Structures are given as C-alpha cells and as structure tokens.
C-alpha cells in the first residue's frame, strides 16, 4: 500500500505532460480580408514578429495572431484557453492600416508571440515603432521607417527611403533593383548590417562610429545614389 501513493506521484507528471503535449498551443487570429485600398501600414506597441509582402498575385489582406511558446505554454494550454492577444487590435483608417500590439498580462506564465502577416499593394509606406521586433519585408515599398530598442530586419525588394533608429539592430537590406533615388539612414548603438545593391553600382556611403568594421567592394562615390549614412557606437557592415 505504501508504494501506491509513490506510484501515483511518479505517473502523474508523465500523464500531465502527455495530455499537455496532445493539445496545441492556443492560437487566436484576427483578419482583415481586403486591403486593396491601403497605401500605408503603421505598426506600434509591444514586441511582435512581422511578415509583410507586396505580391500582386495574392489577395491583399492582413492577419494578427497570437501563439503561446516557451516551456510553460503546453501546461497553460492544458489548463486554460485564454486568448494571449486580447489587447491587440488592427483597423483601417482611410488608406492606412493601423496595427497596435499589446502584450498579455505580466501574470501570464507563458511566452506569447504576436505574429503580424500582411500582403499590401506595392508602393505602400511602412512604419514600425515597437520596443522589439523581427520583421521580414518582401516587396516594393515607397518608404520604410523603423524605430525601437531592438530590431531584426530582413528586407528584399525596393524602397526609395529606409530610415532605421534603434539601440540594437541586425539588418539585411537587399535591393532587387536600383533606381538611383535610394536613401538609407541607420542609427544604432550596436549594428550588424548587410546592404546589397548589386554589382558595379556606385554608392555614396558614410559610416561614423566609435568602433567599426566596414567591408565594401568599392570605395564611396560622393554624390552618387544610392546614398547610405550610418551612425553608431559599434558597427559591423557589409556593402555590396
């Protein structure tokens, strides 16, 4: 009889773990189906994972979803089914898509990842102002304005203007074409960046930093476009 309670104690954690793993992390989604009239996107608030495209062969729309991750997430999903995205919202005001990210309560024992996915018409302007985020931007935009404390940005496409302001930045900016009107400005305390414009493209670039490592295939050409200005404390940048 004495061994029975001990067996219960040994088996219960296994059963709880199995039941937890059998249930998926809680996912909640809000969607706006038609963004054909949108000309700008403004994302603000708390941290999120962002994916924005400008594909004409797919419907224009946006979704905002929350997913619980981290080692507490499976246990939380077993006991509760609360929405981790309760305070975030998304709306269209005229031609602007506004997305405001609000984190779940600090009492929430799990890690809630807010995911933003949108496909908007080419030529739209994009502004991101968040404390921390990762962003995958694939397409043709008019301008990109990014501000925050920590930013991880991957860009593949074209934008006439890119402005990034953050304490810590990791950026990969790969232009698929050059129209000789591009301006890139990055200010960060710590920066690790790659900028690709293509082979044999004259670039006017300036890097100002306390400590820097700059790898460029060709010297700066004053007055040329694209124009790149980088200011920071600790900078590592490759320019191609």
What annotation goes with each model-predicted range?
Residues 1-2:
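N-terminal secretory signal peptides that target proteins for export/translocation
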Residues 7-17:
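Bacterial N-terminal signal peptides
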Residues 18-129, 138, 145, 156, ...:
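Acidic (Asp/Glu) and glycine-rich low-complexity loops/linkers
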Residues 135, 153, 171-173, 193:
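Fold-core signature of tandem repeat domains
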């Amino acid at each position: 009889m004495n061994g029975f309670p001990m067996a219960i104690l040994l088996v219960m954690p296994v059963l709880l773990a199995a039941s937890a793993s059998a249930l998926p992390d809680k996912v909640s989604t809000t969607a706006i189906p038609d963004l054909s009239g949108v000309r700008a996107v403004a994302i603000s608030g708390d941290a999120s994972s962002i994916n924005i495209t400008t594909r004409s062969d797919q419907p224009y729309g946006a979704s905002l979803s929350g997913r619980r991750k981290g080692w507490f997430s499976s246990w939380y999903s077993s006991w509760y089914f609360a929405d981790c995205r309760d305070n975030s919202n998304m709306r269209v005001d005229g031609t602007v898509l506004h997305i405001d990210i609000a984190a779940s309560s600090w009492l929430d024992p799990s890690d809630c990842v807010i995911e933003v996915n949108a496909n908007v018409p080419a030529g739209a302007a994009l502004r991101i102002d968040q404390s921390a985020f990762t962003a995958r931007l694939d397409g043709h935009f008019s301008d990109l304005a990014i501000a925050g404390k920590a930013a991880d940005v991957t860009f593949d496409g074209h934008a006439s203007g890119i402005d990034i302001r953050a304490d810590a930045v990791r950026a990969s900016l790969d232009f698929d074409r050059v129209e000789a009107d591009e301006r890139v400005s990055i200010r960060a305390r710590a920066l690790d960046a790659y900028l690709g414009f293509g082979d044999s493209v004259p670039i006017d670039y300036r890097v100002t930093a306390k400590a820097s490592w700059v790898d460029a295939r060709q010297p700066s050409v004053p007055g040329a476009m694209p124009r790149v200005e980088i200011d920071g404390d600790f900078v590592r940048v490759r320019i191609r």
